[in-house]
């Protein structure tokens, strides 16, 4: 019998773990962290704090574009990193894709769209019931707008293409990267959520329903 879950998601910590995250253990089954866990390596001790929470719930992370190789190694040492990996929990396949598409800022963990596509397609192509944990948001959604007045989209076109091509199999895409684009959106059947640094989401797999809450209201 499938156990329904509550999945909580956060993103863009930049080395600071909101105190409320420790309370997630009281109700969450899985915590996903969508990258930029540190600020170019600063605040790396936050990874150990996340690892401590894995005694109470599954903790699944991907690195962001601002996370260095040292950060990735630290995530691996605590077995939290699901970048380009699959972690099956109950009937859901959690798939991670870390880093971002190219930015103007030459950050440590950026890739071409071709690289992103090749990294992700090889993981998702034979899977069903996928929960995608991505740092970069899919292109042309409410999750990737950098200037809310000018409607400029900067997300990954490869991630969007894969969501479109495997729309029946990808039920959810949790992402971050663009701090100002806090949203719940959809691409076809796929729920897309960017909680932004100031919020977290809770996804109820039984109801197939997601809500966003501010940390200051916890």
Swiss-Prot record:
This is Uncharacterized protein MJ1162. InterPro entries: Calcineurin-like_PHP_ApaH, Metallo-depent_PP-like, PAE1087_MPP. It comes from the Archaea. It comes from Methanocaldococcus jannaschii (strain ATCC 43067 / DSM 2661 / JAL-1 / JCM 10045 / NBRC 100440). It holds the Pfam family Metallophos. One of its GO terms (molecular function) is hydrolase activity.
């Amino acid at each position: 019998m499938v156990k329904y879950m509550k999945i909580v998601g956060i993103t863009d910590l930049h080395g600071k773990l909101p105190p409320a995250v420790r309370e997630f253990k009281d109700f969450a089954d899985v915590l996903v962290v969508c990258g930029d866990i540190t600020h170019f390596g600063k605040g790396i001790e936050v990874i150990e704090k996340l690892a401590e929470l894995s005694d109470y719930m599954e903790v699944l992370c991907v690195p962001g574009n601002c996370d260095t190789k040292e950060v990735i190694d630290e995530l691996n040492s605590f077995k939290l990193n699901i970048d380009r990996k699959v972690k099956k929990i109950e009937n859901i396949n959690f798939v991670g894709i870390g880093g971002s598409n190219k930015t103007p800022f030459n950050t440590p963990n950026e890739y071409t769209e071709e690289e992103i596509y090749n990294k992700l397609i090889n993981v998702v192509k034979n899977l069903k019931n996928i929960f995608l944990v991505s740092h970069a948001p899919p292109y042309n959604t409410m999750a990737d707008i950098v200037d809310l007045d000018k409607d400029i989209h900067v997300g990954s076109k490869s991630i969007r293409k894969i969501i479109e091509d495997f729309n029946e199999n990808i039920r959810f895409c949790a992402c971050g990267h663009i701090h100002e684009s806090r949203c719940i959106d959809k691409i076809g059947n796929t729920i897309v959520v960017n909680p932004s640094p100031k919020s977290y989401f809770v996804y109820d797999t039984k109801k197939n329903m997601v809500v966003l809450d501010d940390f200051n209201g916890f």
